[in-house]
Swiss-Prot record:
SUPFAM superfamilies (UniProt xref): Adenine nucleotide alpha hydrolases-like
Name the UniProt record assigns to this protein: Sulfate adenylyltransferase subunit 2
Provenance organism: Shigella boydii serotype 18 (strain CDC 3083-94 / BS512)
EC number: 2.7.7.4
Gene designation per UniProt: cysD
Superkingdom, natural source: Bacteria
């Protein structure tokens, strides 16, 4: 019997599906963190494949800051309804009561209270012992050294010096009461892999990833798309329509657009072939201080 050769993308797909099934079988109360971006869309697609024709054996969790793009919220609700997924949405009530605002309080405090603390609140509230995330090792150097099974203590903290070996796709999921893991099925994927797989599998994505004329202003070296009226213009700032798209999505005041004419998936794939910069270069939360992502992850960030 001839052995079937798997393409690079099919090998990645098989590995991710294996990881998702392992976690679903091994842990009592898993959840999939759904941030609405391209990686979340791929991860959800893989999870649906893993359990087809059945439904997902775990819910989706969106930790909402109240500052996502409107198109992201519309896409989130439409996707959950179309696929019949259980969608949990959590917003830090203390942060809401405090009126936490990225413009007033800055990116570091906004991220810590609305995202990190919000995530920990949700994990504690529902008692999840495993949480799938869409992080990839090629995104950022602290993520590059993180294991696929990323262990967290009872305070959801990550210790990069206390990670378990992962040999030959064998994962040790033993945890003590109160501990949990974050699981990254897309760890070995690259940004180019993600886009090629989206094109190959015809996966639906937020339209913000495709270039279009959008209202933007330049601030702190970033092209900020103005998504609503919660912004005060600084002296000399002018909102202009420019042809832009997003390589990564987050809170709109903290996520920069890139000038681009790529309006189709093949054009994006071609653009990525010659790109020499990280997709996270325009995420303000990654610029807070040196090693800011690792510090956030140590405190319980995604």
């Amino acid at each position: 019997m001839a052995q079937k050769r798997l393409t690079h993308l099919r090998q990645l797909e098989a590995e991710s599906i294996h990881i998702i099934r392992e976690v679903a079988a091994e842990f009592s109360n898993p959840v999939m963190l759904y941030s609405i971006g391209k990686d979340s869309s791929v991860m959800l697609h893989l999870a649906r494949k893993a359990f087809y024709p059945g439904t997902l054996p775990f819910p989706l969790l969106h930790v909402d800051t109240g500052w996502k793009f409107r198109e992201m919220y519309e896409f989130r609700d439409r996707t959950a309804k179309a696929y019949g997924c259980e969608l949990l949405v959590h917003k830090n009530p203390e942060g809401v009561a405090m009126g936490i605002n990225p413009f007033v309080h800055g990116s570091a405090k906004h991220t810590d209270i609305m995202k990190t603390e919000g995530l920990k609140q949700a994990l504690n509230k529902y008692g999840f012992d495993a949480a799938f995330g869409g992080a990839r090792r090629d995104e950022e150097k602290s993520r590059a050294k993180e294991r696929i099974y990323s262990f967290r203590d009872r305070f959801h903290r990550w210790d990069p010096k206390n990670q378990r070996p992962e040999l030959w796709h064998n994962y040790n999921g033993q945890i003590n009461k109160g501990e949990s893991i974050r699981v990254f099925p897309l760890s070995n994927w690259t940004e180019q892999d993600i886009w090629q797989y989206i094109w190959l599998e015809n996966i639906d994505i937020v339209p913000l990833y495709l270039a279009a004329e959008r209202p933007v202003l330049e601030r702190d070296g970033m092209l900020m798309m103005i998504d609503d009226n919660r912004i005060d213009l600084q002296p000399g700032e002018v909102i202009k329509k420019r042809m832009v798209r997003f390589r990564t999505l987050g809170c709109w005041p903290l996520t920069g657009a890139v000038e681009s004419n790529s309006q189709t998936l093949p054009e994006i794939i071609e653009e990525m072939l010659v790109s020499t910069t990280s997709e996270r270069q325009d995420r303000v939360i990654d610029r807070d201080q040196a090693g800011s992502m690792e510090l956030k992850k140590r405190q319980g960030y995604f």
